């Protein structure tokens, strides 16, 4: 029967091998609240061990987008899983939730155990760094759905926060300040444009881009995980709103965390722009304003705090080895929910 299934495009033995290869990676992400092990029909997590009075569950799901295509084309699969984790846990973190567990979904033309192991290694690396248990997942072999060598990767994360500590941005008010946490690079958005510019420029991706790092490694630098530094701030500073700067850049994401009646005023000269964005802008002849509508431009996550807490917040983030800047302030509402100052043509 296995041979018949294999002839139809599904190799169950390759699937078994992939599972065996990923077990050691998954195991290092486990938390004491996880019940049982791999292989069940469902994964269980004991919320009572969190010792929360009124726990609110927060969930998020996302993928990596066409950054995957760049990784696949250059046979580099060991960090793309970090991106999948980051895109989900950074999102739920904006509510003040601590990520608890993660599930991944890999769909592929053909299960190649070595490749699946590398993908799951990256997922496990991201989970381990954020103390998030990788409690389940699915690997689907669908030869008629994907071209040879191709796969898609998505994830689902669940976190928890005390109901009284849930952050939704509703109490943001004028006079508060915005703290920006540095990104690690492009993160996981805008890659349809990035790949187009790579192709048009005919750049040698193995050539050095900056400080001994190749173009390829620069473009595939994993999305930064903000969980540990932000939770460290949350323990000592009252946070009013948080934003994960993803697709749509500053213009689409920062207003999502603000109530009616206020405007976020951002000084783009208050933080450095990584060289990779300068390269993209030059190669694509892109207007500066549009760059902030596509990319994170060097700031991957923002916090809104009281002005009196700004220095303390920056100090905590420095202790967490995260570059951070006071990038703006909350003002009375103007015509737009966000205004960027210092933008050069």
Swiss-Prot record:
A GO cellular component entry from the record: cytosol
Any single biological process term in GO: adenine biosynthetic process
Domain of life according to the entry: Bacteria
InterPro entries listed in its UniProt record: PurM-like_C_dom (IPR010918), PurM-like_C_sf (IPR036676), PurM-like_N (IPR016188), PurM-like_N_sf (IPR036921), PurM_cligase (IPR004733)
GO molecular function ontology, one term from the record: ATP binding
Reactions catalysed, as given in the entry: 2-formamido-N(1)-(5-O-phospho-beta-D-ribosyl)acetamidine + ATP = 5-amino-1-(5-phospho-beta-D-ribosyl)imidazole + ADP + phosphate + H(+)
Main subcellular location: cytoplasm
UniProt entry keywords in alphabetical sequence: ATP-binding, Cytoplasm, Ligase, Nucleotide-binding, Purine biosynthesis
Coiled-coil portions: none
Homology family: Belongs to the AIR synthase family.
Protein name per the record: Phosphoribosylformylglycinamidine cyclo-ligase
Native source species: Staphylococcus carnosus (strain TM300)
């Amino acid at each position: 029967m296995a041979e018949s299934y294999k002839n139809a495009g599904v190799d169950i033995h390759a699937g078994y091998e992939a599972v065996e290869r990923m077990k050691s990676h998954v195991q290092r992400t486990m938390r004491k609240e996880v019940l049982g092990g791999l292989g069940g029909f469902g994964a269980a997590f004991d919320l009572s061990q969190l010792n929360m009075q009124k726990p609110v569950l927060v969930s998020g799901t996302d993928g990596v987008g066409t950054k995957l295509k760049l990784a696949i084309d250059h046979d580099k699969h060991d960090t793309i899983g970090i991106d999948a984790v980051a895109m989900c846990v950074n999102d739920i973190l904006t509510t003040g939730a601590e990520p608890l567990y993660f599930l991944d979904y890999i769909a592929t033309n053909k299960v190649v155990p070595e490749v699946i192991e590398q993908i799951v290694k990256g997922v496990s690396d991201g989970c381990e760094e954020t103390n998030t248990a990788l409690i389940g997942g699915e690997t689907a072999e669908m030869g008629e759905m994907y071209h040879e060598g191709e796969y898609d990767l998505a994830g689902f994360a669940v976190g928890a926060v005390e109901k009284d500590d849930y952050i939704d941005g509703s109490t943001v008010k004028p006079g508060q300040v915005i703290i920006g946490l540095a990104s690690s690079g492009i993160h996981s958005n805008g890659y349809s444009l990035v790949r187009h510019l790579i192709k048009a420029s005919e750049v040698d991706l193995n050539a050095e881009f900056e400080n001994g790092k190749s173009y390829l490694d620069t473009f595939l630098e994993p999305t930064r995980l903000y969980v540990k530094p932000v939770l460290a701030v949350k323990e000592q500073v009252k946070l009013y709103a948080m934003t994960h700067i993803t697709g749509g850049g500053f213009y689409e994401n920062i207003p999502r965390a603000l109530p009616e009646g206020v405007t976020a005023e951002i000084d783009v000269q208050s933080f450095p722009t990584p060289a990779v964005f300068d390269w993209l802008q030059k190669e694509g002849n892109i207007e500066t304003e549009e760059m902030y509508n596509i990319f994170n431009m060097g700031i991957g996550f923002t916090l809104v705090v009281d002005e009196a807490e700004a220095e303390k917040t920056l100090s905590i983030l420095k202790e967490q080895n995260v570059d951070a800047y006071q990038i703006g302030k909350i003002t009375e509402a103007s015509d737009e929910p966000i205004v960027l100052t210092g933008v050069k043509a």
